[in-house]
Swiss-Prot record:
Family annotation (SUPFAM superfamilies): Coiled-coil domain of nucleotide exchange factor GrpE (SSF58014), Head domain of nucleotide exchange factor GrpE (SSF51064)
Family recorded in the similarity comment: Belongs to the GrpE family.
Localization per record: Cytoplasm
InterPro entries xref list: GrpE (IPR000740), GrpE_coiled_coil (IPR013805), GrpE_head (IPR009012)
Gene from which this protein is expressed: grpE
Gene Ontology process terms (BP): protein folding
Name of protein: Protein GrpE
Chain residue ranges for the region called Disordered: 1-40, 191-210
Compositionally biased intervals (Low complexity): 11-23
An example Gene Ontology CC term for this record: cytoplasm
UniProt keyword annotations, A-Z: Chaperone, Cytoplasm, Stress response
Organism annotation: Rhizobium johnstonii (strain DSM 114642 / LMG 32736 / 3841) (Rhizobium leguminosarum bv. viciae)
Species lineage: Bacteria, Pseudomonadati, Pseudomonadota, Alphaproteobacteria, Hyphomicrobiales
Signal peptide: none
Function per UniProt: Participates actively in the response to hyperosmotic and heat shock by preventing the aggregation of stress-denatured proteins, in association with DnaK and GrpE. It is the nucleotide exchange factor for DnaK and may function as a thermosensor. Unfolded proteins bind initially to DnaJ; upon interaction with the DnaJ-bound protein, DnaK hydrolyzes its bound ATP, resulting in the formation of a stable complex. GrpE releases ADP from DnaK; ATP binding to DnaK triggers the release of the substrate protein, thus completing the reaction cycle.
């Protein structure tokens, strides 16, 4: 048997078939295995996700800080609201006592009565001053355009000399605390006069800003 016969025999055919099968399996395996992702792209995606998460967390913390500051401010400003509202009844009684004394009585009062009147007036001023130090301010609506946010109309007064719907009388004083109405002023408003001017009216808080 020659060398060519040996090379081309059954063994050679089997070897070639095995090699072909191995190559086929390797090729199929390579096709089935997914391509590996780029690690740099993975890091970029992870970095973007972490950045978005950080920005959301920072925004939530900022909102929480602002909300907490607002709640603390409101708590300080309005914590005395209940007590102040009770003190308004005392202030009302002092004012009624002073209003019950006619100008003639004041003018002819003896020393004892004059001292008593002065004491009541001083007490009223001291109370209003103490309330104002805690953010409670008395409204002065006479001459202002009626504002349902701050005033409660009790009656109308026919008066053609002042603009219609102008506050001309105060029955019970109104008060604010901070930017809220603690108690609206009970007022009488003018009726029958000209319409109020469209010009911008002064806010009840202008005195505070002045």
């Amino acid at each position: 048997m020659t060398d060519d016969t040996t090379k081309n025999g059954p063994d050679a055919t089997a070897a070639d078939a095995a090699a072909d099968a191995t190559a086929y399996v390797e090729n199929e395996t390579a096709q089935q295995e997914p391509a590996q992702p780029d690690p740099i792209e993975l890091l970029k995606a992870e970095n973007g996700e972490l950045r978005d998460r950080y920005l959301r967390l920072a925004a939530e913390m900022d909102n929480l800080r602002r909300r907490t500051e607002r709640e603390v401010k409101d708590a300080k400003s309005y914590s005395v609201a209940g007590f102040a509202r009770d003190m308004l009844a005392v202030s009302d009684n002092l004012r009624r006592a002073l209003d019950a004394i006619s100008p003639e009585t004041k003018a002819t009062a003896d020393a004892g009565l004059s001292t008593l009147i002065e004491g009541v007036e001083m007490t009223e001023r001291a109370m209003l001053s103490a309330l104002e130090r805690h953010g409670v301010r008395k409204l002065e609506p006479v001459g202002q355009k009626f504002d349902p946010n701050f005033h409660q109309a009790m009656f109308e007064v026919p008066n053609p000399d002042v603009p219609n719907n102008t506050v001309v009388q105060v029955v019970q004083a109104g008060f604010t605390i901070g930017e809220r109405v603690l108690r609206p002023a009970m007022v009488g408003v003018a009726k029958g006069g000209p319409k109020p001017a469209e010009a911008e009216t002064n806010s009840v808080f202008d005195e505070k800003d002045a």
